[in-house]
């Protein structure tokens, strides 16, 4: 992704902060409006939670909420990133601001449960699972039969090894929607199997018969549009697999633009220069995340009715990539496809033998996204 001129970022940020100051003053006034509850409130009929007040003297409540969400979206899509071998991530401080803005909007619109779900997922992104669980539980108290909320809570209690709580949510989910409960258990089983499988740096010496494919995940390009050493390492691994499997298709997925280049195109050009026939290569130049890598690659696998696929990525990333590709293929096909993975050792494989909590969190988070649960549901802040 192209870097933005610091002066432009500062000007845009100052504009956002000026708007936020005005909104904050209005919001403070709105939230300070008295809410009177009589002593016999429990005997009174059910009433709306929305405050009865004329907002014309301020800004309309709708305008306040719209501005809060617009600011959250601007911060969410900020180009500022931190990169590691496994992935490129949004700034944690930005996600905290996103959470704050969503919760301010929820104070004004207590029927917008989507705001709590979006805020909870922002906390998952930052690794604050306990805080996220609290927000999901708050949302569930307003919508106790919501199958997405039950799915989130079952997942994150499983991640926290809170077995009794996880089983409670799974049991209720099974009563309300047996199909969703079965799918969620399949996700858990897939994650458990993939993380328990030892990482390997080489493919099979005697490939199985049938339609085969290699799926190589891209990595963020350098600011000048050149390929990072990590991506070159993944390509070396891909080339070795391609030579050992001369009939295999090669899917190269990565579409984050940098200096008018994309990962998919540069990867394809590199392999062709190294002697791989371009007719074997499928460029996927649109995915901007590992979730999209899996979804878009799954369509290519389905179109060519691939029976065996080998995913290539960094050792610190490959388990997440394989899990997501398997889940994507549940929905797009091909039915019955078998998927394994080969790692480029961005770190010594011995150091990665046991999955870390941060890696496992990313696997669970993106597994739910790939399955179809949207993390951010509060327009204009919409993202799978």
Regions found by a protein language model. Name each.
Residues 23-31:
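Hydrophobic helical h-region of N-terminal Sec-dependent signal peptides
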Residues 42-107, 113-148, 152-158, 173-359:
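A structural signal for short, hydrophobic/glycine-enriched beta-strand patches
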Residues 32-40:
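C-terminal segment of classical bacterial N-terminal signal peptides
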Residues 17-21:
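Positively charged n-region of N-terminal signal peptides that target proteins for export
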Residues 357-384:
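Low-complexity, Gly/Ser/Thr/Pro-rich intrinsically disordered linker/tail segments
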């Amino acid at each position: 992704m192209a870097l933005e001129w610091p002066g432009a970022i500062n000007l845009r940020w100052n504009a956002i902060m000026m708007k936020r100051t005005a909104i904050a003053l209005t919001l403070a006034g709105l939230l300070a409006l008295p809410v009177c509850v009589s002593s016999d409130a429990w005997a009174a009929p059910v009433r709306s939670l929305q405050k009865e007040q004329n907002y014309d003297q301020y800004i309309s409540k709708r305008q306040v909420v719209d501005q809060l969400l617009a600011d959250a979206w601007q911060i969410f899509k900020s180009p500022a990133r931190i990169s590691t071998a496994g992935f490129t991530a949004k700034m944690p401080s930005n996600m905290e601001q996103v959470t704050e803005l969503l919760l301010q909007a929820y104070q004004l619109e207590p029927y917008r449960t989507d705001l709590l779900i979006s805020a909870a997922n922002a906390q998952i992104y930052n690794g604050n699972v306990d805080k996220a669980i609290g927000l999901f539980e708050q949302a569930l108290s307003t919508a106790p039969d919501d199958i997405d909320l039950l799915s989130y809570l079952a997942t994150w209690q499983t991640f926290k090894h809170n077995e009794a709580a996880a089983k409670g949510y799974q049991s209720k989910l099974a009563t309300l929607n047996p199909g969703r409960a079965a799918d969620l258990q399949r996700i858990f089983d897939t994650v458990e199997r993939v993380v328990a499988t030892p990482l390997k740096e080489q493919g099979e010496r005697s490939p199985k018969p049938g339609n085969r494919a290699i799926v190589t995940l891209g990595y963020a390009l350098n600011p000048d549009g050149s390929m990072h050493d990590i991506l070159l390492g993944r390509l070396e691994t891909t080339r070795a697999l391609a030579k050992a499997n001369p009939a295999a298709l090669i899917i190269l997925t990565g579409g984050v633009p940098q200096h008018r280049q994309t990962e998919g195109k540069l990867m394809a050009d590199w392999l062709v220069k190294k002697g791989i026939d371009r007719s074997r290569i499928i460029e996927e130049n649109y995915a901007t995340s590992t979730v999209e890598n899996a979804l878009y690659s799954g369509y290519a696998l389905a179109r060519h009715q691939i029976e065996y696929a080998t995913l290539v990525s960094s050792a610190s990333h490959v388990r997440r990539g394989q899990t997501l590709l398997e889940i994507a293929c549940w929905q797009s096909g091909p039915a019955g496809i078998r998927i394994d993975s080969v790692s480029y050792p961005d770190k010594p494989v011995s150091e990665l033998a046991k999955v870390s909590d941060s890696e496992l969190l990313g696997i669970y988070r993106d597994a739910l996204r790939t399955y179809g649960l949207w993390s951010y549901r509060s327009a204009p802040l919409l993202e799978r």
